[in-house]
Amino acid sequence: HISAVGFGLYCQLLKRSVARLKGEKQPLLVDTELRLDFVKLAPSDAGESGAAYVPVDYIPGERLRVAVYRRIAEATERDEIEALQQELEDRFGKLPPAVARLLAIADIRILSATHGIQLVEVRNRKLIIKRDGDYVKDSARFASLTASDPDGQLEELRDTILNLVA
């Protein structure tokens, strides 16, 4: 089942099922698809300007790193990402840029899902957003990101989504 839906979605479905069985409110299902051509998610891309992962030299223990990835995948509220960021800083020190990017991506995903956005794609700085089955355009065309670096693009992307839903 995990390979069919992906680890993150599987964890969320499991979390929702447990909440339903306990009679609790079911958490949001965060299934927004992100396709960001300026982000590199593999540890093998270390040193790349858009790398987003948890480096071994930041969290040496493999189990701890996997637990961090799991918490990111299971997060359904922006507060959870903020709490994880604070916990990581308290336990391991200042976040490396790659970890900060990874958390920013998770935040964007949750923010998008909260507002019914199914797809957020950035291709050659062109921003493609799909909500309620329709593409969101600015004056009959897709918006473009103006920032030149990955961190600036992530910030601009988050701000654009916040403005879109305001």
Predicted regions: what they are:
Residues 1-166:
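Accessory helical-bundle/CTD segments and flexible terminal tails appended to RecA-like ATPase motors
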